[in-house]
Curated annotation (Swiss-Prot):
The gene is sspH1. The keyword Transmembrane does not apply. The keyword Metal-binding does not apply. HAMAP family: SspH (MF_00667). InterPro entries: SASP_SspH. It is found in: Spore core. This is Small, acid-soluble spore protein H 1. Belongs to the SspH family.
Length: 59
């Protein structure tokens, strides 16, 4: 995935399934300059991690 698509997903009112290393995640924010996103595991929303947007996959 790229930064442009991450920003589209963030601004969308639709539910778009995204995974990180095969785990379903919600995207919380995107850092365009760093090319990273803050995501959290759908099953464990209390923990978020920063990941490279290229590691995210749209399902």
């Amino acid at each position: 995935m790229d930064v442009k698509r991450v920003k589209q997903i963030l601004s969308s009112s639709s539910r778009i399934d995204v995974t990180y290393e095969g785990v379903p995640v919600w995207i919380e924010s995107c850092d365009e300059q760093k090319g990273s996103a803050q995501v959290y595991d759908v099953s464990n929303p209390g923990e978020s991690v920063h990941v490279d947007v290229t590691a995210l996959e749209e399902k």
